[in-house]
A protein has these predicted regions:
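Short, cysteine/histidine-rich loop/knuckle motifs that typically chelate Zn2+
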Residues: 9-22, 37-50, 106, 129
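Short, surface-exposed linear patches
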Residues: 26, 48, 55-56, 218-222
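Surface-exposed beta-strand edges and their flanking turn/coil or helix-capping segments
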Residues: 18, 25, 47-49, 211-213, ...
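Ferredoxin-like iron-sulfur electron-transfer modules
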Residues: 1-12, 23-40, 54-63
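Acidic, serine/proline-rich low-complexity intrinsically disordered regions
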Residues: 68-287
């Protein structure tokens, strides 16, 4: 594993456990153990008073081509994996998305095989979902905004009965600490060191993922339903570094072109190497 603990120096105080952003360090009996979910971040070193933590023999493998292939094969995924990487301006090698387009629509294109990465900003967004993924809101005049709400969001046959329900439940989800200039969205194998990955899967595949994620740590993956796909998918993984799954909403499912049995899971990328390793260690590896 990337980091190891010197048993002669460790006093098992647990400071590293409480400060590990990946929840990758656990207590086993009287010992503190760094699990395979360690991502080389080194945060734990700064909190170890005894200087008991050092680099191990192995390093986390963040090769996106290798990880994309491994996830696809081990989970028997039928669709491609989307990667997201936030930045203040587009990378030189990535095309600026001109729009109008939906975040969920771009994801759907990549799920279905589009091999092009794009840099997505509010200017290219067709809806307010850009604010829900941490890049700020679109600009619109009052008449346009009211027309969109009344035509597609509010009232009988739409998403909410009344306008006051729009923001209800938003406080469940974390606030973004900053507004990014935009986000690169592309196939996982094309985006180096992304912040997040997101992909569709069925119930059994989700069970495989959650079992592998918690195999060494006992961590669970929370699921959400009832708000927009973008908000439910992105906020927790990006802000709190923990994976989530969700059923999506009407628009998100439509533009992602999800099948009836599919929902989506979003993972912080730094957790993916450990996830891939553990997929070979659970009960599902016996099948």
């Amino acid at each position: 594993m990337p980091f190891v603990i010197d048993r002669e120096l460790c006093v098992a105080c647990g400071s590293c456990i409480g400060n590990c952003p990946n929840s990758a360090i656990v207590r086993t009996g009287e010992q503190v153990v760094i699990t395979g979910m360690c991502s080389d971040c080194g945060t734990c070193i700064h909190y170890c008073t005894m200087g008991a933590i050092g680099k191990g023999k192995d390093k986390a493998d963040f090769n996106t081509k290798t990880l994309a292939r491994a996830l696809t094969e081990k989970l028997s995924l039928k669709k491609n994996i989307v990667a997201m990487k936030y930045a203040s301006k587009p990378p030189a090698e990535v095309t600026m998305e001109k729009g109008p387009h939906f975040w969920c629509g771009i994801c759907g294109d990549i799920f279905d095989g589009d091999s092009s990465a794009v840099f997505f900003t509010p200017k290219a967004s067709s809806c307010g979902g850009c604010a829900n993924i941490g890049i700020g809101g679109i600009k619109a005049n009052k008449e346009e905004f009211e027309a969109a709400l009344n035509g597609q969001v509010l009232g009988e046959g739409n998403l909410y009965a009344r306008k006051d329900l729009l923001a209800k439940g938003r406080s469940i989800f974390p606030q973004y600490p900053r507004v990014s200039g935009g986000v690169t969205i592309g196939p996982l194998e094309q985006v180096s060191m992304p912040d997040l990955i997101i992909f569709p899967l069925n119930g059994k595949q989700m069970c495989m993922v959650s079992t592998a994620y918690g195999f060494e740590t006992g961590e669970v993956i929370f699921g959400y339903a009832g708000k927009s796909t973008c908000l439910m998918s992105i906020s927790f993984p990006y802000v709190e570094n923990r994976p989530v799954f969700n059923a999506g909403d009407y628009g998100g499912r439509t533009f992602m072109r999800l099948n009836d049995e599919e929902f989506v899971v979003c993972f912080p990328f730094r957790l993916v190497p450990g996830l891939v390793k553990n997929l070979d260690r659970t009960v599902f590896s016996r099948e």
